């Protein structure tokens, strides 16, 4: 049986501020770390994990594989590399000569790529388990997973694939839709709408907020009325600054990327694609039109 080696990601500036406080492999998608997703996909393809670079196959640490493309590569020993359109090589095999050009697999090069991977992880998930109850008035149109000790209060509406971790409080009267993953010990409160987003553990979005196509790190607190914008007036693709350069995200909808421990003042408005570095904050009524680094 062929073996694979999955190295650590190392420095990943494209995913800052999220990877300033954790490795990329430790970032949760559908409340499971990227590394665990990668390992599960590779093992399901019939490979065995090795502890060092002498393995038959070496995996790009930011690779996200489409299972069908991975199966094609594994089955044909003549393939020596799996690459994608930007030239990144997701997988190499000793002794192989040919290149398999993948169209569905990708590398998580930027923070917004985590949103894409989260959608795919949640769509592929077969079992959604409810380990805690919800109020009888809760409306679910989709698949909902609820962790232990979590309370879902009256008036909550769920649409799409939603995962809520352990010991959370959700509601009353909030709307969660799309592919949204909420980590352990989070609070999503009165009149909050969340769409296609990721909340890491210990985060609070308590009152009158909109969070769309966004990622919030651990122990973030959104002051009442904090709003993320996710759509340009002209409907064009969002661009976001990375290491001093403006990068086309390829996304028509993109909200905010928020690092660990950020606090926003009440009525903060955040432009699309803006990023707030860990432990930064905003004043009440702030308009965030550029990244906040300190």
List where the protein language model places each region.
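Short, surface-exposed helix/turn micro-motifs that flank interaction/cofactor sites
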Residues: 36, 151, 169-171, 221, ...
